[in-house]
């Protein structure tokens, strides 16, 4: 029986103040390892995401935008699943840059109106 890769999940809540253009790291980088995101969802809480154009999950080098939740579609309590209306996922099932982790961030500006965003990202870690 193979031991790797194992499916992992990064899940949590980030306050709007943490959804800046720099973002918040949700999976720490690990040298010589490659992350492949295979699914996930996001949900705004406390209001609709405003000011930022979108809330994105990307690699920590900011070269691959994995999940992009359009602000207008991130209304309070609505879960945006991968590739649903308002969520674009062009890098699902694609190995990201070796040694990178994952971050969640606001694009263009810090998120306002919504108080926070819940997230759940399913991913594989390979290499070593």
Locate each region found by the language model.
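Surface-exposed, low-hydrophobicity beta-strand/loop segments enriched in small/polar/acidic residues
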Residues: 1-128
């Amino acid at each position: 029986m193979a031991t790797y890769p194992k499916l992992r999940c990064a899940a949590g809540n980030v306050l709007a103040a943490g959804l800046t253009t720099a973002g918040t790291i949700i999976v720490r980088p690990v040298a010589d390892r490659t992350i492949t995101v295979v699914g996930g969802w996001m949900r705004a809480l406390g209001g609709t995401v405003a000011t930022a154009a979108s809330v994105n999950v990307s690699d920590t080098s900011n070269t691959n935008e994995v999940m992009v939740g359009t602000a207008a579609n991130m209304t309070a309590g609505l879960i945006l699943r991968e590739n649903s209306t308002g969520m674009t996922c062009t890098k699902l099932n694609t190995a990201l840059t070796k040694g990178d982790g994952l971050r969640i961030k606001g694009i263009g500006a810090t998120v306002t109106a919504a108080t926070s965003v819940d997230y759940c990202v399913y991913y594989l870690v390979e290499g070593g």
